[in-house]
Amino acid sequence: MNVIWIVADTFRSDHLGAYGNKTIRTPTLDALASRSVRFERHYIASFPTMPTRADHATGRWSMSFMGWEPLPEGQTTLAEILAGVGYHTAAVTDTPFYLRGDMNYDKGFQSFFMHPGQDAQFPEEMLHTHRHESQDIRAAWRHESDRNAPQTFVRASEWLQRHYKEDFFLYVDPWDPHEP
């Protein structure tokens, strides 16, 4: 069995057709959900971004003892467990805190791809393409494919095309959607 875990930060299930919303149209996500394991009663243990990632990685309720900190060295991660039984483990993310400040959230992944998206300066040539808009890098995003989440999913898809015949655990974590 292969596992693809897609993190949708701050994305409310009640806004998806797959979970009963009749007004908002989400056909692509609904189609994915129809072929996937869905959790009807999943509750987060930690609210902030990285403590939630620690919960994902370790299966533990981490907010009460570690907060927004690096993963502890001695803490076993899901990626380590799956790698230990022969899975190729990979993560693709644009969430900026995985590697910042020795956060150690790449622990156990044999392949780890960090799209600089949310944490890097936009390419200089794009910043100056649109006059007077360089103060907000999002102003340079003219096409959907310029945005961080699509670029993260393209990278994940490329990895999947190369490794689909293997036993794998692919963890995909785009930062979007985020702030309210």
Model-identified regions with their sequence ranges:
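Catalytic domains that recognize anionic headgroups
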Residues: 1-180
